[in-house]
């Protein structure tokens, strides 16, 4: 027994020793883990310091790059401003040279025209006068014949065009009428369909409402009847309860008093027996009658409830049908609205077409009147009706010729002004609105120049703003220039011939004309001469400036090419800047990935080292730390 007690006492001691040894081992491992944890904390702090240093270096590099980019932009801006200043000065010098050259050309032409005018005023011999008169008449006749043929050809072309326009207009009107008739028919059919559907729906709704009202009246009547019957049943029940109480009282009285006949008088006993028998018989009949009435009333109530449920079902069905009809009518209503809108649009389009037709007819009438007026004027001013005996008619005809030429010149000037305005407006819309640049670019002051030079300079600027884009535009410009030259030469020749013919006629007529009339005609012709000279100078300026357009266009193309090169250079620099930014961002991302990879490798190395040493318990705290 003692040995067994000893063995039992040794076992707890061995267990406690093993537990203490295990605790000591665990404490040693815990201290090692804490030491390693402190080492890892120090490593993490070092890595954070490295990260801060890398961020500082990256920020410094970014600042250096931004400073370099700003320096490049400043240099580029300075170079651009210098180039623009040099180009502006060169253009100003060139414009001044061109202005001086045009002034010299104008002075030479003015002197030449003055010399020719003096020669014409001095006069010549009679033979020369007659020859000039014959030449003038022949040339005027030829020009008149050519103009008449041209006008006749134009009249034929206008008639053909008018005929085509009238045919197209009639076709359009017929098509519009047919389309309008179709639309009206479709609209009418649609309206009829809508009205029919509305009438049917209203009729169905009225019928259903009448049925609902009739059923509601029936329900109210049945409810009233039910109320009356319930009142009667309640009254009968009350009577029955009263009779039951009387019967109970009579039975109690009979039970308590065994001989009621002795106590009561004989007459009273007989009456009580008779009353008791009658009351019992009446109670039985009343009970049967009440039971029958109650059964009838219950059956009536069941029928009314069934009918009420049927009416409720019918009402729900009618409501459902009304909702379905509303849902079906909704697209029809929307379609009706759309058709109404389309009809309004078609009416507006028909009104516009009618207005266009009225305007076309009005233009046609005006064109007819104009053609008839021109034909009458040409008939009145025909050169075939002239004769040497009618000097006044000759003078009037020449005056009409001068007026016609004046109208032609005025039309040309109006066309030129219109082109100037349109091109000026186009130039204003195309060019940046920098007023000082325009003034320094052309060297003009707004207060010192007159309207003629201002219009000419604006015309020049607007023409120079237009760069020739295609060979077709160049061909159009050359053709318009040749036509302007030919028209200018023809006008000058006709004007000189008319002046010579008018002078010869004045000499032939002599004193037959009135002095005041002659003075008026002379003043008018002088004014016409001055105005024509001004128009001739304007046309000469235009021709000279048209000749100078080529050089200006080339210079402008060079300027545009330089601007395009500068813009491409700026675009390349911006692309390089964006590329550098993207590279910096990629480097930053790569650096962060490398830092994260370093942390992973360090943690993995520490875990591998601990596992190789045999410390299996360290795996759980390492995972918690991660």
Curated annotation (Swiss-Prot):
Residues 13-255, 284-413, 490-604 form a coiled coil. GO terms for cellular component: cytoplasm; membrane; microtubule; microtubule cytoskeleton; ribonucleoprotein complex. InterPro entries: JAKMIP (IPR024836), JAKMIP_C (IPR031994). The modification Phosphothreonine is found at residue 470. It is found in: Cytoplasm, Cytoskeleton; Membrane. Residues 1-365 are annotated as: Mediates association with microtubules. Residues 452-461 have a biased composition (Polar residues). Pfam families: JAKMIP_CC3 (PF16034). Residues 365-626 are annotated as: Mediates interaction with TYK2 and GABBR1. Homodimer. Interacts with JAK1 and TYK2. Forms a complex with GABBR1 and KIF5B/kinesin-1. Belongs to the JAKMIP family. This is Janus kinase and microtubule-interacting protein 1. It comes from Mus musculus. The lineage of its organism: Eukaryota, Metazoa, Chordata, Craniata, Vertebrata.
